[in-house]
Amino acid sequence: MKTLLLTLVVVTIVCLDLGYTLKCNKLIPIASKTCPAGKNLCYKMFMMSDLTIPVKRGCIDVCPKNSHLVKYVCCNTDRCN
């Protein structure tokens, strides 16, 4: 009976597909945050005048287009930014 119950619990967890939560770095890379639902990308924003130091990091739903002043780099794995 215990085996049957354990099997049902495992099957339920697998079938529910509990979902995956993405973690993105904040501005300071040692700190990260869990992205809210619908925000499936991590991003880094750079000023075009200095592409070596990101000025903003976080979660986003759609990667913005680059402009003459700002460059965005987006990715979709944990802490990839």
UniProtKB/Swiss-Prot annotation:
Distribution of this protein across tissues and organs: Expressed by the venom gland.
Annotated localization: Secreted; Target cell membrane
Signal peptide positions (record): 1-21
An example Gene Ontology CC term for this record: membrane
Secreted among keywords: yes
Chain coiled-coil ranges: none
Keywords, comma-separated and alphabetical: Cardiotoxin, Cytolysis, Disulfide bond, Membrane, Secreted, Signal, Target cell membrane, Target membrane, Toxin
GO molecular function: toxin activity
Disulfide bond entries: C24-C42, C35-C59, C63-C74, C75-C80
One annotated GO biological process: killing of cells of another organism
Classification via CDD domains: TFP_snake_toxin (cd00206)
PROSITE patterns: SNAKE_TOXIN
Function: Shows cytolytic activity on many different cells by forming pore in lipid membranes. In vivo, increases heart rate or kills the animal by cardiac arrest. In addition, it binds to heparin with high affinity, interacts with Kv channel-interacting protein 1 (KCNIP1) in a calcium-independent manner, and binds to integrin alpha-V/beta-3 (ITGAV/ITGB3) with moderate affinity.
Subunit record text: Monomer in solution; Homodimer and oligomer in the presence of negatively charged lipids forming a pore with a size ranging between 20 and 30 Angstroms.
Family to which the UniProt record says this protein belongs: Belongs to the three-finger toxin family. Short-chain subfamily. Type IA cytotoxin sub-subfamily.
Full protein name: Cytotoxin 1c
